[in-house]
Amino acid sequence: AVAAGTVMLFADYYSYTEVNGVVVILGFLWNRLWGVYSDPNYGAVFSAITIIMSLYFYKDAKKPLKALYIINIVLQICYIAFSDSRTGMVSLFCALLVYVYLTALRSKKLEAKKAFARGVICVLLAVTAAVASFAAIKVVSVSTSEFKKWQYEHIISSDKDKTDAQKEKDKQKLEIGRQSNDINGDVSNRRFAIWGSGLEIFKTKPLTGVTFRNYVPYAEDKLPDTYLVNNDFIEFHSMHNSFVDILVSQGILGVVIIAAYIILVLVLIFKNFFKFKGEKYKYNTALLSIIAPIFASMMFYSETFYMNTGGAFLFWLALGYLIQSVTSKNSEAKEITPGK
């Protein structure tokens, strides 16, 4: 998908169609690389997860495979840059914080350090890695924009087969990413308004909610002026935040149930997480680092709960494996071989 999307970027290919009332976008449109994903945010979060998996397998891989893992990491960073997904960048930041911190914590080079000093060093390494990923994304974005400007000045602008209107349209594609006027000064890209509308709906039925698939019919009937169904864009069928989704869909009862579940799972994981060493610890770290970016993405779009998406599948799969792994006794745990 990343390779296909990259070809679409440099070929300026895009497709904009409507299927059963749902807009389907492919390629490079509105200065963002959608690729073959229904939403570039999905692709960017998958890229963050793929980077973590490449790092996990890299250390124990043979040299030819190491080169492929490096190339893969570069491609995934490129996709996040071209997609201009802030959700993807936040997810990658969280994934690297978790992975680098936990990996460094058990590094043999830091074993001699005192606990406090080791902790500080691990935090610094994790933050450095996360910030470096942001810098890499920015470099890719800026350098690609400069290349496209060169391409326009030396090739497209002198193309006699293109009309002035076509050339002007090509000129608008020179920048990678949304510009400030694209989101009309709204840094949340409508999310704040959607969340506010969700709270309006929640107040009408706070205890049990209105159910997830009933947002639009309920709002049209009870709150026809709320932003969810009355705006200058489209009707929104989700809250673009998984926890606001729960609040509106299942009310206070749903929030209490989910909060209790999250707390119990976290206690179960971290009560046992640091009991393991070696490959089992690395394996658990990789699983937790897959869960972290998906959990972070839940703050910015509807994911995991009520959804049948690739991200939901990965989240529950990784969480299931992690819980099984950390709750198994050392004597019961199967030997995990290093990734090749």
Predicted regions: what is each one?
Residues 1, 8, 47, 69, ...:
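Transmembrane alpha-helices of multi-pass, membrane-embedded glycan-processing enzymes
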Residues 1-21, 36-109, 292, 297:
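Alpha-helical transmembrane segments of multi-pass inner-membrane proteins
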Residues 21-22, 180-204, 208-250:
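Long extracytoplasmic/lumenal interhelical loops at the membrane interface
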Residues 34-47, 87, 239-242, 247-251, ...:
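Membrane-interface micro-motifs in multi-pass membrane enzymes
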Residues 58-67, 102-115, 272-277, 322-340:
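Membrane-interface junctions at the ends of membrane-embedded or membrane-associated helices
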Residues 92, 96-99, 261, 286-340:
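Transmembrane alpha-helices of multi-pass inner-membrane enzymes
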Residues 97, 101-106, 113, 223-228, ...:
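Hydrophobic transmembrane alpha-helices and their immediate junctions
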Residues 103-182, 196-204, 212:
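A membrane-periplasm/extracellular boundary helix in multi-pass inner-membrane enzymes
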